[in-house]
């Protein structure tokens, strides 16, 4: 279910403040955030935002194609270790 149109997109206030401060500054720095639920706005394009995945902050470079998506979509929280491999003994006995 998508968000209601009348509510508009959501972005954390602290993240917006950091993005606005970054736009005023000349140096580009990585912005750390824990707000995976924030929607990416056009003003974020060209910035690098480090999104928390539960263990560490993963840097994500924002492009125009990402506008309208959530920050959490680009940083997976679960690591896939692969399926359990079969033993050689189990396959050779059958």
Curated annotation (Swiss-Prot):
- What InterPro entries does the record point to? Ribosomal_uS19, Ribosomal_uS19_bac-type, Ribosomal_uS19_CS, Ribosomal_uS19_SF
Instruction: List GO molecular-function terms, semicolon-separated.
Output: rRNA binding; structural constituent of ribosome
Q: Which organism is it from?
A: Lactobacillus acidophilus (strain ATCC 700396 / NCK56 / N2 / NCFM)
Protein's job: Protein S19 forms a complex with S13 that binds strongly to the 16S ribosomal RNA.
A Pfam family this chain is assigned to = Ribosomal_S19
Alphabetic keyword roster: Ribonucleoprotein, Ribosomal protein, RNA-binding, rRNA-binding
Gene name of the encoded protein: rpsS
Key word Ribosomal protein present: yes
Family designation: Belongs to the universal ribosomal protein uS19 family.
Give a GO cellular-component term.
small ribosomal subunit
Please provide the Gene Ontology terms (biological process) for this protein. Answer: ribosomal small subunit assembly; translation
Name this polypeptide is given:
Small ribosomal subunit protein uS19
């Amino acid at each position: 279910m998508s968000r209601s149109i009348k509510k508009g997109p959501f972005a954390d206030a602290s993240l917006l403040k950091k993005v606005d401060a970054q736009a005023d500054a000349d140096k580009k720095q990585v912005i750390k955030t824990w707000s995976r639920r924030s929607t990416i706005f056009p003003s974020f394009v060209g910035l690098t935002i480090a999104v928390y995945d539960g263990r560490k902050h993963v840097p994500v470079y924002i492009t125009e194609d990402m506008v309208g998506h959530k920050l959490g979509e680009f940083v997976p929280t679960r690591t896939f270790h692969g399926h359990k491999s079969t033993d050689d003994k189990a396959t050779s006995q059958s």
